[in-house]
A protein has these predicted regions:
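Adenosine-cofactor binding site in Rossmann-like domains, unifying the SAM/SAH pocket
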Residues: 5-27
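SDR active-site strand-loop-helix element
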Residues: 12, 37-43, 81-87, 139-142
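NAD(P)H-binding glycine-rich loop region in Rossmannoid oxidoreductase-like domains
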Residues: 19-62, 91
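Conserved Rossmann-fold NAD(P)-dependent oxidoreductase catalytic core, especially the SDR/UDP-sugar
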Residues: 66-113, 138
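NAD(P)-dependent short-chain dehydrogenase/reductase
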Residues: 93-101, 124-186
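Active-site loop-to-helix junction immediately N-terminal to the catalytic Tyr of the SDR YXXXK motif
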Residues: 108-114, 128, 154
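Active-site helix of classical SDR
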Residues: 114, 118-121
Length: 186
């Protein structure tokens, strides 16, 4: 983004800016005054994590989404939001072949119910804030995300993060095998 002349402001870590807190969210956006905001903020983890922490996952993610849109509205910013909706928002029946026009044609899979549901909520919030307040949003359906800041905790990490971490740890420790959970089926 910097290469095309855009100023990139990376959100600080949660300990210095908690998007679940409205005052923190307003302070961040008031200081940054972004033209575009790529919303990657999420509390998410492995299938076990999102199931065992379903209430926290849906509450904290909904709070972050609402705080971002409310802060933009309250500060009268003309920020355009780019929201990422993970493939877990697709219906359970389409887990093998994703088609963009079918992403809301049924309930999300029970293994990702909390996170998949709140990703759909992201889309609904963006549409409502655009209708009433003119907040422009581009929603992208993404198959997966990986990068700096992701968890490498084996009980919390997504599959790709967990696998990379396990293989690196095994290589570093000279281990001859790596434990991989499950079959890959949802």
């Amino acid at each position: 983004l910097s290469a095309v002349g855009l100023t990139v402001v990376k959100a600080p870590p949660r300990k210095t800016c908690d998007l679940r807190d409205m005052d923190s969210t307003i302070a961040l956006l008031n200081k940054a005054q972004p033209d575009y905001l790529v919303n990657c903020a999420a509390q998410v983890g492995s299938l076990n994590y999102v199931t065992n922490h379903a209430g926290e996952v849906i509450t904290n993610n909904a709070r972050m989404i609402l705080n971002i849109y409310e802060a933009i509205k309250n500060l009268s910013l003309s920020t355009r939001v780019i929201s990422l909706v993970a493939n877990c928002a697709y219906p359970a029946t389409t887990m093998e072949a994703f088609k963009e026009d079918e992403w809301q044609n049924g309930p999300v899979h029970s293994s990702v119910f909390a996170y998949g549901s709140v990703r759909r909520f992201t889309w609904a919030v963006s549409k409502c804030y655009e209708m009433q307040y003119g907040t422009e949003t581009i929603t992208l359906l993404v198959p997966n995300m990986y990068g700096p800041g992701d968890s490498t905790d084996p009980d919390k990490a997504h599959a790709l993060n967990a696998l990379i971490s396990k293989f690196l740890r095994a290589k570093r420790n000279g281990e001859k095998s790596v434990s991989v959970w499950g079959t890959g089926a949802p």
